[in-house]
Regions:
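Active-site neighborhoods and metal-handling regions in enzymes and metal-associated proteins
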Residues: 1-174
Length: 174
């Protein structure tokens, strides 16, 4: 909430990061990983690490991937916000809906690989519905199109290790 407010108030990446840290009760040195705070085009750079002190002329979007820690338990909080861009706002809302629907399917014993593939198919459906990609979702998956928009794994063990590796392993960890 604090990061979103700083973004909407026109803050710089550094100011948005400072607002997040203050709200989380942390400093840069005690978060579980370096926060990613990216305005506008910077959000397209995977693991963007620069937090500019300069306020952009126009803040159109914010991507924040920030950590927090309580009693040795690490959390990874990732959010994206858009301002004054109807299509991007619709994309964010649609991806949020699909993420929540997929999260509700998680059960003990469910194969992670199936969820990972379903996430790509759901993303493909969103991209097609919004007219961003003119292909069927299964064709997008087959040709690696969804990987352009989703270049990482579905998730990772929060609290144990806060970085995931793209792809997936079999039940024996291979």
């Amino acid at each position: 909430v604090a990061a979103r407010k700083a973004f909407l108030d026109g803050g710089s990446e550094a100011q948005i990061n400072a607002a997040y840290l203050a709200a989380a009760g942390h400093t840069d040195s005690d978060v579980p990983y370096n926060n990613i705070v990216a305005l506008n085009e910077n959000g397209a750079t995977l693991h963007y690490q620069y937090k500019s002190f300069a306020r952009p002329d126009e803040s159109r979007s914010l991507l924040i991937d920030a950590g927090a820690e309580v009693d040795g338990y690490s959390a990874d909080i990732t959010r994206t916000w858009a301002r004054d861009d109807e299509l991007f706002g619709e994309l964010i809302e649609a991806v949020d809906r699909e993420q929540q629907a997929l999260a509700h399917k998680v059960r003990a014993g469910l194969d992670y690989r199936q969820l990972h593939l379903e996430a790509h198919l759901r993303l493909g459906s969103v991209l097609k519905a919004l007219g961003i990609v003119d292909m069927e979702p299964d064709a997008m998956l087959q040709h690696g199109v969804t990987s352009t928009f989703f270049p990482h794994g579905l998730g990772h063990p929060i609290g144990l290790q806060v970085h995931d590796v793209a792809g997936y392993s079999d039940v024996d960890g291979q």
